[in-house]
């Protein structure tokens, strides 16, 4: 919700707010109402934040409702970008967002371990460090 609020003033960006239950910890809208709306959309990109990202397990989250909505966004998108800090790389959380082979791009910080970055690039994922 906070990102939608920031981008709403930019006329060249179309903002869709799904509805659903607000999750205060992450400002996400989750639940059946959000799922119903997302199921009707086609997206060019899904840009997702996650709690953990492992080369074998993929992207995961601590909260299953959050993971479910993010999974649905990933399945509705042509491209999936995961944005996460390096402390979450090589980690796993409770609920899967998407498998590694569903990820197109990872954006992380420069403190990421080279072996973990290599594990993602070997799987055909573009890795951007900034």
Predicted regions and their residues:
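Conserved phosphate- and dinucleotide-binding cores of soluble alpha/beta proteins
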Residues: 2-130
């Amino acid at each position: 919700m906070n990102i939608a609020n920031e981008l709403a003033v930019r006329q060249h960006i179309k903002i869709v707010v799904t509805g659903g239950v607000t999750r205060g910890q992450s400002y996400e809208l989750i639940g059946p109402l959000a799922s119903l709306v997302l199921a009707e959309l086609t997206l060019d990109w899904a840009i997702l934040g996650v709690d953990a990202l492992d080369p074998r397990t993929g992207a995961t989250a601590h909260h299953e409702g959050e993971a479910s909505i993010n999974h649905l966004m990933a399945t509705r998108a042509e491209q999936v970008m995961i944005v996460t800090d390096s402390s979450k790389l090589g980690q796993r959380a409770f609920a899967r967002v998407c498998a590694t082979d569903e990820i197109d791009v990872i954006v992380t910080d420069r403190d990421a371990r080279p072996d973990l970055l290599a594990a993602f690039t070997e799987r055909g994922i573009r890795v951007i460090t900034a």
